[in-house]
From Swiss-Prot:
<feature type="region of interest" description="Unknown">
    <location>
        <begin position="1"/>
        <end position="193"/>
    </location>
</feature>
<dbReference type="Pfam" id="PF01040">
    <property type="entry name" value="UbiA"/>
</dbReference>
<comment type="pathway">
    <text>Porphyrin-containing compound metabolism; heme O biosynthesis; heme O from protoheme: step 1/1.</text>
</comment>
<dbReference type="GO" id="GO:0008495">
    <property type="term" value="F:protoheme IX farnesyltransferase activity"/>
</dbReference>
<feature type="transmembrane region" description="Helical">
    <location>
        <begin position="115"/>
        <end position="135"/>
    </location>
</feature>
<feature type="transmembrane region" description="Helical">
    <location>
        <begin position="336"/>
        <end position="356"/>
    </location>
</feature>
<dbReference type="GO" id="GO:0048034">
    <property type="term" value="P:heme O biosynthetic process"/>
</dbReference>
<feature type="transmembrane region" description="Helical">
    <location>
        <begin position="441"/>
        <end position="461"/>
    </location>
</feature>
<comment type="function">
    <text>Converts heme B (protoheme IX) to heme O by substitution of the vinyl group on carbon 2 of heme B porphyrin ring with a hydroxyethyl farnesyl side group.</text>
</comment>
<keyword id="KW-1003">Cell membrane</keyword>
<keyword id="KW-0812">Transmembrane</keyword>
<feature type="transmembrane region" description="Helical">
    <location>
        <begin position="409"/>
        <end position="429"/>
    </location>
</feature>
<keyword id="KW-0350">Heme biosynthesis</keyword>
<protein>
    <recommendedName>
        <fullName>Protoheme IX farnesyltransferase</fullName>
        <ecNumber>2.5.1.141</ecNumber>
    </recommendedName>
</protein>
<feature type="transmembrane region" description="Helical">
    <location>
        <begin position="265"/>
        <end position="285"/>
    </location>
</feature>
<feature type="transmembrane region" description="Helical">
    <location>
        <begin position="286"/>
        <end position="306"/>
    </location>
</feature>
<dbReference type="GO" id="GO:0005886">
    <property type="term" value="C:plasma membrane"/>
</dbReference>
Amino acid sequence: MAESRTFTGLLAATAVGVYLLVLAGATTTLTDAAAACTTWPLCDGPVDVTNTALLVAWGHRLVAAAVGLLVVAMAVVGLRSGCRGRVKAAIIIGAVLYPVQIALGAIVATSAETALPGAHLALGMGIFGSFVLALAWHLEAETGSDDETPVKNPTPAPEPAGDDTPDRTPALTFRERLVGTASAYFRLMKPRLMWLLCLVAAAGMALAAGQTLTVRTVLLTLGGGVLSIGASGTFNHVLERDIDKRMDRTSDRPIATHQIPVRNALAFGLLLSFASLWLFWQVNALVAVLGLTAIVFYSVIYTLVLKPNTVQNTVLGGAAGALPALIGWVAADGSVGLPGVVLAVIIFLWTPAHFYNLALAYKDDYEAGGFPMMPVVRGETETRKHIVYYLGATLIASGILGVLTPLGWLYAVTSVLLGAVFLWAVVLLHREQTEAAAFRAFHASNAYLGAVLIAIVVDALAL
């Protein structure tokens, strides 16, 4: 058991080390450094502590050597520990490709061939992906349970019987009723979703426009975004009001408790929709179209079609969270651009790695609601493995964004550090398998994406 845990730590550390090298190469972090050191393995001339580019080049090669030693140690421990065949295969592939990667890096450093850096970076991502797969499969074998009994077709629990006890709540003053009603309408808008989705849109705008971004565009886009999120949340409350009564987590929602009548909630949702689309239209027509698409997708396609009918609801539903990236980019640029699409892909891939943690924590609640969430239908072991899959894919997509944009060291460092925190929280989730561990990984996922989006905004606007 101790040897297995040692191997898990080495494998996770190796994956993070490889990712550090990938992000450094994907962003502009090494652009000047490559020109400052065109020999290999050492740089010509004495080390100049005032030459930042030269120090970065030296640092990159030293880190590559250290990660190489880590790869060797991890491979030796892993192959000796008796891990399963596919884990061994993934380790061997990554370990064999690593010296090839070093050799290719040497050629890149000493050659002017423009196609080689791309191949060097792609190979690095492949090595990282190989180690992530090895980690996912090893954790599954180490911590998985054969005693799980997934429910293929979860049936909603009966709606709780009404309480006929007379209401003895003291009469409220007009001010108390007003505050309570306003608070209930605010809850309909799902305000907890707003900060992160607005950050997604802000990152899209920053990437598209850089320092030419105008305050008017920001205010109109984020204002429309807040209102569209509120509209989507309100319609979701209306459509799931009966199911909300069956779930502990949602049984106190305003419509489920009849605090707000359905008719009033629908009117409120429509008002928010029209207001958001009007603000989006002030930016441009395509932003308004994307905003309407986001509202319809979340309110109708996700809530009525995907969520109650397919185990892939979380994956496919990630499109709703990805749309703000395109909205932000189009608001600043006027058309859809490839970096904006890649940012949307990052959010799409991040969503399962993020939300599956919540699905684990509220597994019984989702089963009571009749939702075929991954932990309910496929089991907790499979769900934890998929979290690692999607986390690895998210990090690779983040590397691709670095290639397509002039993002630099701040983005690279943030993505690596917070990605490592997120990954380790997921490793602990596999080991502990508790509700607290699921919430820890959930919050780590929020911290990762929030920090990366802030880094994008700062990098694009200020650095």
